[in-house]
Amino acid sequence: MTSGSPKITNLLTRVKRIIPPLLDTFHKGQAGRVGVFGGCQHYTGAPYYSSMSSMLFGSDQSHIFCEKEAANVIKSYSPDLIVHPFLREKDKAGPEDSVDKCFELIKPMMGRLHAIVIGPGLGRDEWMQEIMAKVIEYARKNDMPMVIDADGLWLIQQRPELVSGYHNVILTPNVIEFKRLCDKLDIKSDGPDACNQLAGKLNLLIIQKGQSDIISDGATAYACSVPGGLKRCGGQGDILTGILATFLAWRHAYLSKEWDTEGNMDAKECLFLAAFGASACTRWCSRLAFKECGRATQSTDLVRHVGKAYNALMEDEIPSVEEKIKD
């Protein structure tokens, strides 16, 4: 943890408060409807990892909005996925297609979602990026929680004003993406206070992924040092986005008081707790998969352990969690 920040187990105790109970009075979708925006001809796995992880962690539904040519491939991964082929790459668009028409297909769905993820498998095609800019603008206007990762961060690097000052978004850069964002804003990326500086300059929350994940809004910073696995396979960041989106959907339910909630945490505190909970559970998921598979670990192995990671850190009693983390 960073100096002066709470113990891991104290934070996890608070994280648990935003998790909705499993009640027979709840209806389908009340425990979270997540939207994942990404998936193109070359990248179909990333949106699957994000969407599937969100459901395996506990959201009721997850929708994938992807490029038309990626849709059937993504659908084939699981019948649990809801796939909308509403995105278009510029060189594959027909004469009837346009950025505005694509967004008009998406817009009616947005009101059904509690949290969205932008970036997994998105690519950098001009149209795909422009459509996402419209999605971000709409989400911000309607105060929707957002997670932005991967090539969604490429868009933010080009147009930081899309999210600057927005209180309901979390950026999740890896080391390369973090450096690009810092370079854009004239911040030394390898400085000891770089995450605080970047978060402060953008005036939003960042999870800087690394040996320990640094979570900062520019004023307060926590370090999540829950031990993870040692295999750095592609796709782990996508799993983080899905778990994080589920936490943000639960945060929405908590703040809406959809059950008799414990305590009276505000939106800002819940945002921090969602970020910390997602980081901790993703890292523990990686640890479980690595323990089983070792050097052969792939992100498909992590997906199989998402539910186990939830049970280990969110369902077990804190003393046993504390012992697990020490092991």
Swiss-Prot record:
GO terms for biological process: metabolite repair; nicotinamide nucleotide metabolic process. One of its GO terms (cellular component) is cytosol. InterPro entries: Carbohydrate_kinase_pred_CS, CARKD, Ribokinase-like. Its main location: cytoplasm. Belongs to the NnrD/CARKD family. Its cofactor is Mg(2+). This is ATP-dependent (S)-NAD(P)H-hydrate dehydratase. The keyword Ubl conjugation does not apply. It comes from the Eukaryota. It comes from Schizosaccharomyces pombe (strain 972 / ATCC 24843) (Fission yeast). Gene3D superfamilies: 3.40.1190.20.
